[in-house]
């Protein structure tokens, strides 16, 4: 019967030792977890900032692309009109030249 009591005492001491060890380890881990949490929050804020900047850059890129398309179209129209000028001058010249004879 003594062996049973000794076994129970060893079991009780083991459980107490386990509890003390768990509490000590928890106290050691808590600061690291808090630091990890704060780092994670800071990273999340940076990610949100990057997302916002990405959206702004995408909007600016679209505006620039639209502006380039408008200017390209305008330049093409101007070039087409400039190409027509020599023919128009030639026609006016010929019309004026024939009238003066």
Curated annotation (Swiss-Prot):
Pfam families on file: DUF948
Lineage: Bacteria, Bacillati, Bacillota, Bacilli, Bacillales
Official protein name in the record: Uncharacterized protein YoxC
Protein's gene: yoxC
């Amino acid at each position: 019967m003594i062996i049973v009591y000794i076994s129970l005492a060893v079991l009780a001491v083991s459980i107490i030792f386990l509890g003390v060890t768990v509490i000590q380890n928890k106290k050691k881990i808590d600061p690291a977890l808090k630091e990890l949490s704060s780092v994670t929050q800071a990273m999340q804020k940076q990610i949100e900032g990057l997302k916002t900047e990405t959206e702004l850059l995408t909007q600016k890129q679209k505006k620039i692309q639209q502006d380039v398309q408008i200017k390209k179209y305008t330049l093409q129209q101007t070039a087409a009109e400039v190409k027509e000028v020599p023919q128009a001058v030639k026609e006016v010249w010929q019309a004026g030249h024939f009238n003066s004879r």
